[in-house]
From Swiss-Prot:
This is Porphobilinogen deaminase. The keyword Transferase applies. The modification S-(dipyrrolylmethanemethyl)cysteine is found at C250. It holds the Pfam family Porphobil_deam. Monomer. Belongs to the HMBS family. The lineage of its organism: Bacteria, Pseudomonadati, Pseudomonadota, Betaproteobacteria, Burkholderiales. It comes from Burkholderia pseudomallei (strain 668).
Amino acid sequence: MNSETLPAELPATLTIASRESRLAMWQAEHVRDALRKLYPACDVKILGMTTRGDQILDRTLSKVGGKGLFVKELESALADGRADLAVHSLKDVPMVLPEGFALAAVMSREDPRDAFVSNDYASLDALPAGAVVGTSSLRREAMLRARHPRLDVRPLRGNLDTRLAKLDRGDYAAIILAAAGLKRLGLAARIRALLDVDDSLPAAGQGALGIEIAARRADVAAWLAPLHDHASALAVEAERAVSRALGGSCEVPLAAHAVWRGGELHLTGSVSTTDGARVLAAHAHARAATAADALALGRRVSDALERQGARAIVDALVAASAQAQKGGA
């Protein structure tokens, strides 16, 4: 980028809000370094924050309020001016942002697949019957129960290092993690196998970094524009459109994955019951040049899932989750 294309009125300082986990800080530092390279005269800082999602580790997200627990404190910092932007793993961002906030940039995507991690076994198929497998999401839990019913699937909370420590001390025979996080932290060697998307369809936005801002900050949006990867953003928008249309959240084993092939965006969506007894899937593809195109593609897939009965599954799971939260209040 040359001086003629730089946004006007660059600030003296830009502050990035981030969770304080090692992975979250890596992501914030990745954005910070990119901004420093673009704007060397600007002092880019990171404001580390602890979110409620980081603090509540004894219950699954579906029972304590969902993905918004990881972003609310960061959004408060955006709203009151303590931070100019917030960096998120997009799979942790609610499908509908609160009023007054916007997703300003999606960076080039890392590997969206799930990873099988174990100290003793090479793959899910190699695990003996009754082996304990840990996962942090209902989506992965449903996948495991559907494809590997002989395994003992149990919840696994905590940041990436905590989850690996629980595996290493013998609490689990294996755990399922996002490949992107392991690769970003230089832990790719811990991956024993990458799960094919046909076997474990990723969460919407998995592997992508999103940068959120206060919607009123058009200036920040302009400064972030060079970081935006259009192809990744369209894929993520299509995926999130599936989940958004169905009311997807942590209460629902819902997956969506889009990939570019031959100039077209190919999108697959899936909804299942938590026990894996019923799995619905739909696929569509189209040429997508704009966010509206990606949204339309997502709606085609969500409509196809609804015709198969996805709405009844989603509504039942959301109602059950609400009852569980009420009972635990």
